[in-house]
Amino acid sequence: MGTLLDTTVFIDLERAVRRLAPASAMAEVSGRLEHQPGADEEVAIAAITASELLHGVHGATPEHRPRREALVEAVLAAFPPLPFGLLAARVHARIWAELAVAGQEVGAHDRLVAAAAIAAGWRVGTANIRNFDRIASLDTLTISFTS
């Protein structure tokens, strides 16, 4: 099993390591991930997570942009995006329909992350479990850098 990290993990990381250089921050990530998902486990991000992280770079103030961009580029180099293919699209459609029938809402990006993880037989690593707890077929793991 692998772990697909969602954007909240990296938001939490950025808050935890504001005073560290991006390389030091990535060393912190590696150390934490060895203890949380497991040292031998595959870890990646979803393509939508890459987009969300890059959106954060483009939306940052000129003062914060260089640091955020360095951190995001380090994340993208360390955790390649898991492709979103037809199987993930089928899983996404099922999740979306099940939630709609149940009258429950999960954000579009979180549904895409969940679908990619389920299609790969992986779980989602998140700093905010509430984003995913309504998706019955999804295995999750809380990953925090601030607690």
What are these regions (language model features)?
Residues 1, 114-147:
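Acidic, PIN/NYN-like endoribonuclease modules and their adjacent C-terminal/linker elements
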Residues 1-45, 57-74, 147:
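Short, well-structured N-terminal submotif of metal-dependent ribonuclease cores
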Residues 6, 12, 52, 110, ...:
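Acidic active-site catalytic centers that drive phospho-/nucleotidyl reactions
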Residues 8, 70, 90, 111-112, ...:
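Active-site phosphate/pyrophosphate-handling residues
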Residues 10, 50-53, 89, 132:
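A generic structural signal for short hydrophobic patches within well-formed alpha-helices
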Residues 45-48, 127:
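Substrate-recognition element of Asp-dependent hydrolases with the DxDx(T/V) motif
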Residues 55-58, 66, 78-125:
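Active-site neighborhoods of divalent-metal-dependent phosphate/nucleic-acid chemistry enzymes
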